[in-house]
Amino acid sequence: MTRLVVGFDLDMTLVDSRPGIGATYRALAEETGTFIDVDLVTSRLGPPLEAELAHWFEPERVPEVADRYRALYPDLAIPRVELLRGAREAVQAVLDAGGEAFVVTGKNGRNAALHLQHLAIDLDVVGEVWREGKADVFRARGVTAYVGDHVHDMEACRSADVVGIAVPTGPCSPDELRAAGADHVVDDLHGVVGLVPDLPR
Protein backbone atom coordinates (compact mmCIF):
# COMPACT_ATOMS: atom_id res chain seq x y z
CA MET A 1 0.00 0.00 0.00
CA THR A 2 1.41 3.39 -0.97
CA ARG A 3 1.34 6.33 1.39
CA LEU A 4 -1.21 9.11 0.99
CA VAL A 5 0.63 12.20 -0.28
CA VAL A 6 -1.46 15.27 -1.08
CA GLY A 7 -0.14 18.46 -2.63
CA PHE A 8 -1.91 21.79 -2.29
CA ASP A 9 -1.64 24.86 -4.45
CA LEU A 10 -1.29 28.12 -2.52
CA ASP A 11 -2.74 31.19 -4.28
CA MET A 12 -6.54 31.01 -4.48
CA THR A 13 -6.52 27.41 -3.21
CA LEU A 14 -5.28 27.59 0.37
CA VAL A 15 -5.21 31.39 0.60
CA ASP A 16 -7.03 34.36 -0.90
CA SER A 17 -3.93 36.21 -2.01
CA ARG A 18 -5.70 38.87 -4.08
CA PRO A 19 -5.48 41.67 -1.46
CA GLY A 20 -1.76 41.12 -0.91
CA ILE A 21 -0.86 40.68 -4.55
CA GLY A 22 -2.94 43.71 -5.45
CA ALA A 23 -1.19 45.87 -2.86
CA THR A 24 2.21 44.78 -4.12
CA TYR A 25 1.35 45.48 -7.75
CA ARG A 26 0.01 48.92 -6.85
CA ALA A 27 3.24 49.77 -5.06
CA LEU A 28 5.25 48.43 -8.00
CA ALA A 29 3.23 50.50 -10.46
CA GLU A 30 3.74 53.66 -8.41
CA GLU A 31 7.44 53.01 -7.93
CA THR A 32 8.13 52.29 -11.61
CA GLY A 33 5.67 54.79 -13.08
CA THR A 34 4.09 51.98 -15.09
CA PHE A 35 0.37 51.46 -15.59
CA ILE A 36 -0.76 48.06 -14.29
CA ASP A 37 -4.41 47.07 -14.30
CA VAL A 38 -4.35 45.52 -10.85
CA ASP A 39 -7.96 44.33 -10.96
CA LEU A 40 -7.18 42.43 -14.16
CA VAL A 41 -4.02 40.96 -12.65
CA THR A 42 -5.80 39.68 -9.55
CA SER A 43 -8.62 38.21 -11.64
CA ARG A 44 -6.27 35.80 -13.41
CA LEU A 45 -3.83 34.59 -10.77
CA GLY A 46 -2.03 31.35 -11.45
CA PRO A 47 0.76 31.69 -14.02
CA PRO A 48 4.29 32.62 -12.89
CA LEU A 49 5.03 36.20 -11.86
CA GLU A 50 7.28 36.81 -14.86
CA ALA A 51 4.48 35.85 -17.25
CA GLU A 52 2.19 38.48 -15.74
CA LEU A 53 4.86 41.16 -15.60
CA ALA A 54 5.55 40.62 -19.31
CA HIS A 55 2.12 42.15 -20.01
CA TRP A 56 3.22 45.45 -18.44
CA PHE A 57 7.00 45.75 -18.87
CA GLU A 58 9.50 45.40 -21.68
CA PRO A 59 11.07 41.93 -21.76
CA GLU A 60 14.50 43.15 -20.70
CA ARG A 61 13.01 44.76 -17.57
CA VAL A 62 11.03 41.75 -16.38
CA PRO A 63 13.80 40.05 -14.33
CA GLU A 64 14.70 43.16 -12.33
CA VAL A 65 11.04 44.11 -11.82
CA ALA A 66 10.27 40.57 -10.65
CA ASP A 67 13.06 40.85 -8.10
CA ARG A 68 11.65 44.15 -6.88
CA TYR A 69 8.13 42.73 -6.64
CA ARG A 70 9.40 39.84 -4.53
CA ALA A 71 11.29 42.26 -2.29
CA LEU A 72 8.17 44.37 -1.72
CA TYR A 73 5.93 41.36 -1.18
CA PRO A 74 6.66 40.34 2.44
CA ASP A 75 5.76 43.68 4.02
CA LEU A 76 2.86 44.52 1.71
CA ALA A 77 1.22 41.17 1.02
CA ILE A 78 1.74 38.78 3.91
CA PRO A 79 -0.37 40.71 6.49
CA ARG A 80 -3.25 41.13 4.00
CA VAL A 81 -3.71 37.47 3.04
CA GLU A 82 -6.03 35.05 4.83
CA LEU A 83 -6.82 31.37 4.54
CA LEU A 84 -9.70 30.34 2.33
CA ARG A 85 -12.66 28.53 3.83
CA GLY A 86 -11.80 24.98 4.87
CA ALA A 87 -8.04 25.27 4.27
CA ARG A 88 -6.94 24.32 7.75
CA GLU A 89 -9.47 21.49 7.92
CA ALA A 90 -8.44 20.05 4.54
CA VAL A 91 -4.78 19.93 5.49
CA GLN A 92 -5.58 18.43 8.88
CA ALA A 93 -7.76 15.75 7.30
CA VAL A 94 -4.79 14.53 5.26
CA LEU A 95 -2.53 14.50 8.31
CA ASP A 96 -5.14 12.76 10.46
CA ALA A 97 -5.38 10.04 7.82
CA GLY A 98 -1.66 9.38 8.24
CA GLY A 99 -0.78 11.16 5.04
CA GLU A 100 1.72 13.80 4.04
CA ALA A 101 0.64 17.27 2.90
CA PHE A 102 2.80 19.92 1.30
CA VAL A 103 2.48 22.98 -0.95
CA VAL A 104 3.43 23.04 -4.63
CA THR A 105 3.15 26.55 -6.06
CA GLY A 106 4.26 28.82 -8.83
CA LYS A 107 4.99 31.47 -6.22
CA ASN A 108 8.50 32.19 -4.97
CA GLY A 109 9.18 29.59 -2.31
CA ARG A 110 10.38 32.06 0.32
CA ASN A 111 7.27 34.21 0.10
CA ALA A 112 5.02 31.15 0.02
CA ALA A 113 6.66 29.91 3.22
CA LEU A 114 6.12 33.32 4.83
CA HIS A 115 2.39 33.02 4.15
CA LEU A 116 2.24 29.63 5.82
CA GLN A 117 4.27 30.85 8.78
CA HIS A 118 2.02 33.90 9.21
CA LEU A 119 -1.10 31.72 9.08
CA ALA A 120 0.34 29.01 11.36
CA ILE A 121 0.23 26.24 8.75
CA ASP A 122 3.27 23.97 9.09
CA LEU A 123 3.88 22.57 5.61
CA ASP A 124 6.89 22.13 3.35
CA VAL A 125 6.89 24.24 0.18
CA VAL A 126 8.09 23.55 -3.34
CA GLY A 127 8.00 26.89 -5.14
CA GLU A 128 8.41 28.38 -8.61
CA VAL A 129 6.97 25.42 -10.47
CA TRP A 130 4.12 25.62 -12.95
CA ARG A 131 2.19 23.26 -15.17
CA GLU A 132 4.60 20.47 -16.25
CA GLY A 133 7.00 21.58 -13.54
CA LYS A 134 4.33 20.69 -11.00
CA ALA A 135 3.87 17.31 -12.69
CA ASP A 136 7.59 16.66 -12.26
CA VAL A 137 7.28 17.40 -8.54
CA PHE A 138 4.28 15.08 -8.26
CA ARG A 139 6.29 12.25 -9.77
CA ALA A 140 9.37 12.91 -7.67
CA ARG A 141 7.43 13.13 -4.40
CA GLY A 142 5.03 10.26 -5.06
CA VAL A 143 1.98 12.52 -4.91
CA THR A 144 -1.34 10.68 -5.00
CA ALA A 145 -3.64 13.72 -5.18
CA TYR A 146 -3.33 17.45 -5.76
CA VAL A 147 -5.71 20.24 -4.84
CA GLY A 148 -5.68 23.32 -7.08
CA ASP A 149 -7.81 26.06 -8.59
CA HIS A 150 -6.38 26.38 -12.11
CA VAL A 151 -6.83 24.37 -15.30
CA HIS A 152 -3.05 24.05 -15.53
CA ASP A 153 -3.07 22.38 -12.10
CA MET A 154 -5.46 19.77 -13.45
CA GLU A 155 -3.37 19.34 -16.59
CA ALA A 156 -0.35 18.66 -14.37
CA CYS A 157 -2.38 16.04 -12.50
CA ARG A 158 -3.30 14.32 -15.75
CA SER A 159 0.31 14.36 -16.90
CA ALA A 160 1.54 12.77 -13.66
CA ASP A 161 -1.44 10.43 -13.28
CA VAL A 162 -2.50 11.73 -9.88
CA VAL A 163 -6.01 12.50 -8.64
CA GLY A 164 -6.91 16.10 -9.43
CA ILE A 165 -9.16 17.88 -6.94
CA ALA A 166 -10.31 21.29 -8.12
CA VAL A 167 -11.77 24.21 -6.19
CA PRO A 168 -13.37 27.00 -8.28
CA THR A 169 -12.05 29.71 -5.96
CA GLY A 170 -9.62 31.09 -8.52
CA PRO A 171 -10.00 32.26 -12.12
CA CYS A 172 -11.36 29.00 -13.57
CA SER A 173 -14.98 27.85 -13.60
CA PRO A 174 -16.12 24.36 -12.55
CA ASP A 175 -16.76 23.48 -16.20
CA GLU A 176 -13.28 24.63 -17.23
CA LEU A 177 -11.72 22.61 -14.42
CA ARG A 178 -13.67 19.49 -15.40
CA ALA A 179 -12.69 19.95 -19.04
CA ALA A 180 -9.04 20.15 -17.96
CA GLY A 181 -9.36 16.73 -16.36
CA ALA A 182 -10.32 17.30 -12.73
CA ASP A 183 -11.42 14.07 -11.05
CA HIS A 184 -13.37 16.01 -8.42
CA VAL A 185 -14.67 19.58 -8.32
CA VAL A 186 -15.68 20.74 -4.84
CA ASP A 187 -17.22 24.05 -3.82
CA ASP A 188 -14.49 24.82 -1.30
CA LEU A 189 -11.83 23.06 0.73
CA HIS A 190 -14.37 21.62 3.15
CA GLY A 191 -15.27 19.35 0.25
CA VAL A 192 -11.74 17.95 0.27
CA VAL A 193 -12.22 16.61 3.80
CA GLY A 194 -14.90 14.18 2.65
CA LEU A 195 -12.73 12.93 -0.21
CA VAL A 196 -9.67 12.07 1.87
CA PRO A 197 -10.81 8.61 3.06
CA ASP A 198 -11.22 7.43 -0.54
CA LEU A 199 -8.02 8.88 -2.01
CA PRO A 200 -5.45 6.38 -3.36
CA ARG A 201 -2.85 5.04 -0.97
Model-identified regions with their sequence ranges:
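Non-catalytic pre-domain segments flanking phosphatase-related domains
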Residues: 1-8, 194, 198-201
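N-terminal helical cap/lid subdomain that shapes the substrate entry/recognition surface
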Residues: 2-88, 97
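Substrate-recognition element of Asp-dependent hydrolases with the DxDx(T/V) motif
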Residues: 25, 87-116, 128
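Well-formed, non-transmembrane alpha-helical positions, independent of function
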Residues: 93, 115-118, 137, 156-159, ...
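Structural recognition of alpha->loop->beta junctions
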Residues: 119-128, 178-194
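Short loop-to-alpha-helix "cap/lid" segments that border enzyme active sites
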Residues: 130-141, 151-155
